[in-house]
Amino acid sequence: MVCYKQVSIYLGEDKTKCILFTKKKTHKQLNICNKSAKIKQHKTIDYLGCILDNNLSGEHMVLKVLNKVNSKLKFLYRQSEHLNPQLRRMLCNALLQPHFDYASTSWYPLIKQCYKQILQVAQNICIRFCLGL
């Protein structure tokens, strides 16, 4: 018996996603059905702003963070002639740093060393922008 029926929870099949967390690169497809609708299994899901992949490598989340930070940093560099150092630092703290910090305890320890270095380079670029170098 499925427990969500016992507590009268409606399960929207079109929004419901299934993911199997495993270290193996290849794994069996789960066959989960609700009445007649089959729930699709995904390799990555977006949950509360974090991208979780089936092997918890964190690579997709790193790429998302880098994309957001780089796009905002390009905009700030275009406006840099109008910004004093104090305002630059405030904008970096308000617009860029939250992307590095958001849920980092869940994805940062699991990423490969090469991604950690790429994130460090991105943070160094942010610091150079703050200092006007």
Predicted regions span which residues?
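Short, conserved micro-motifs composed of acidic
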Residues: 2, 9-43
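Charged/polar positions within long, soluble alpha-helices
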Residues: 2-5, 9, 78-81, 101, ...
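Short, glycine/acidic-rich hinge or "gate" loops at secondary-structure transitions
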Residues: 10-14, 110-117
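Structured beta-strand/turn binding interfaces of compact recognition modules in eukaryotic regulators
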Residues: 21, 55, 122
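Basic, alpha-helical interaction scaffolds
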Residues: 36-107
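A terminal-accessory region detector
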Residues: 113-133
